């Protein structure tokens, strides 16, 4: 959520920054919310004047009674003032609801470093690590390798739950688990994160706090009759651990790494990478979440990207980093980098991690603040998160990049102690 004061004082600047945001967003709603706020502020001034008048009249009543004067008219005036205050309070509450409705739907303001552009074609590549894997044979896709090696069962996943669900079997299940453990060990022992194992279901307030609601409700799996949502990412429960809290400034930055299953309806994504493990309704991920002071956040974003890179480098998987353009930025981010791993069957790089700085956008929604001393006025923290990284896509990348001509797959060196084998065959 944006700062309403900033909307009032820098209206045209904000409207310009939010133009071409790629969110089907009409910047004219900013004028609407400012008009509603002006109306609310005017009524609040009137209410304060009425309360002052009521206090003055109330103070006169005992004096008049003591003097033996009739207070009937004064009492009637008191009731009339009270009715006006009640009506104005109701109007303010109505305006608050309207303002909040709009504010929750206004996207974050892009950082000046965000490239101009409308689609992912306009994202800017800033780094490559490793070279795309070359083969002297025709490489297989990960879904064929997974089936041939009896690691993945897409057919039974579909029978159990429907399309875009997968059963991991035998060494496939062990590979998934090994990657999870490797990522968590890397981030906690080497990169300085504190591990969290969060709930997989959250309430509406939590989904609103991180920005999934109200805009993306159709992409979420909702549990009927009780208001719970299955989490689309561990970012939601981990960020909301500190909702409505004031953190100690000297404890920042706080860094958490969390493994979780993730659940996404992916409405409207039919036909886009729906074969194999790339776009599933349920998948595993290790998420990195940070809370820091505003002046720390962009340095922490750079470190976050490096931490996500470290696990891919450890696995020897070639990747590139792109800076996301304005039209592809997403609702909550101020600046975002995607890390894309090389997938031979696609002959292109495929997203495996997104790392974002939300500045105080989520903190305002979730009311997460900090202060450096007990007497200091609390300020909103900056929040960041990144995939550290998606597990299923890592499985796919390993199968495709480490495959051999005979159909076997070499285990990356970093995973051998977890897998207790050198080769999948």
Swiss-Prot record:
Job description of the protein: Catalyzes the attachment of serine to tRNA(Ser). Is also able to aminoacylate tRNA(Sec) with serine, to form the misacylated tRNA L-seryl-tRNA(Sec), which will be further converted into selenocysteinyl-tRNA(Sec).
Gene Ontology terms, MF aspect: ATP binding; catalytic activity, acting on a protein; serine-tRNA ligase activity; transferase activity
Entry's localization field: Cytoplasm
PANTHER family membership: SERINE--TRNA LIGASE (PTHR43697:SF1), SERYL-TRNA SYNTHETASE (PTHR43697)
Binding site residues for ATP: 264-266, 351-354
InterPro entries noted in UniProt: aa-tRNA-synt_IIb, aa-tRNA-synth_II, aa-tRNA-synth_II/BPL/LPL, Ser-tRNA-ligase_type_1, Ser-tRNA-synth_1_N, SerRS_1_N_sf, SerRS_core, tRNA-bd_arm
Main location, first listed in the record: cytoplasm
Protein's name according to its UniProt entry: Serine--tRNA ligase
Any Pfam family hit: tRNA-synt_2b
């Amino acid at each position: 959520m944006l700062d309403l004061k900033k909307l009032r004082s820098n209206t045209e600047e904000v409207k310009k920054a939010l133009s071409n945001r790629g969110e089907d967003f009409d910047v004219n709603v900013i004028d609407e919310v400012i008009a509603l706020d002006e109306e609310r502020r005017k009524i609040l001034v009137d209410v304060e004047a009425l309360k002052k008048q009521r206090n003055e009249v109330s103070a006169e009543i005992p004096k008049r009674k003591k003097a033996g004067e009739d207070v009937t008219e004064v009492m009637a005036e008191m009731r009339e003032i009270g009715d006006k205050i009640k009506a104005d309070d109701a109007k303010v509450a109505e305006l608050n609801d309207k303002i909040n409705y709009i504010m929750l739907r206004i996207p974050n303001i892009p950082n000046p470093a965000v490239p101009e552009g409308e689609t992912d074609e306009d994202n800017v590549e800033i780094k490559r690590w490793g070279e795309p894997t070359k083969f002297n044979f025709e490489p297989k896709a990960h879904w064929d390798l997974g089936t041939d090696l009896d690691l993945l069962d897409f057919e039974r996943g579909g029978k159990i739950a429907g399309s875009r669900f997968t059963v991991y079997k035998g060494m496939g299940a062990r590979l998934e688990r090994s990657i999870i453990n490797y990522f968590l060990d890397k981030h906690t022992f080497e990169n300085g994160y504190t591990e969290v194992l969060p709930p997989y279901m959250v309430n509406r307030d939590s989904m609103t706090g991180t920005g999934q609601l109200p805009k993306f409700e159709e992409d979420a799996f909702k549990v009927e009759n009780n208001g719970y949502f299955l989490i689309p990412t561990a970012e939601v429960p981990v960020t909301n651990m500190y909702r409505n809290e004031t953190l100690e400034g000297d404890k920042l930055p706080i860094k958490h790494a969390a493994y979780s299953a993730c659940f996404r309806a992916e409405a409207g994504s039919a036909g886009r990478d729906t074969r194999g493990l790339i776009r599933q309704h349920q998948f595993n991920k290790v998420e990195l979440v940070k809370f820091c002071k505003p002046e720390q956040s962009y340095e922490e974003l750079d470190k976050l990207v490096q931490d996500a890179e470290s696990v891919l480098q450890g696995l020897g998987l070639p990747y590139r980093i792109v800076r996301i353009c304005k039209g592809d930025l997403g609702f909550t981010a101020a600046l975002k980098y995607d890390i894309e791993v090389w997938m031979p069957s696609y002959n292109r790089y495929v997203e495996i991690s997104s790392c974002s700085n939300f500045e105080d956008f989520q903190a305002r929604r979730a009311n997460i603040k900090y202060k450096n001393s007990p007497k200091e006025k609390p300020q909103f923290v900056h929040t960041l998160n990144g995939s550290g990284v998606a597990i299923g896509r890592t499985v796919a990348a390993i199968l495709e990049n480490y495959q051999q001509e005979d159909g076997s797959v070499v285990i990356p060196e970093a995973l051998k102690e977890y897998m207790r084998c050198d080769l999948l065959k």
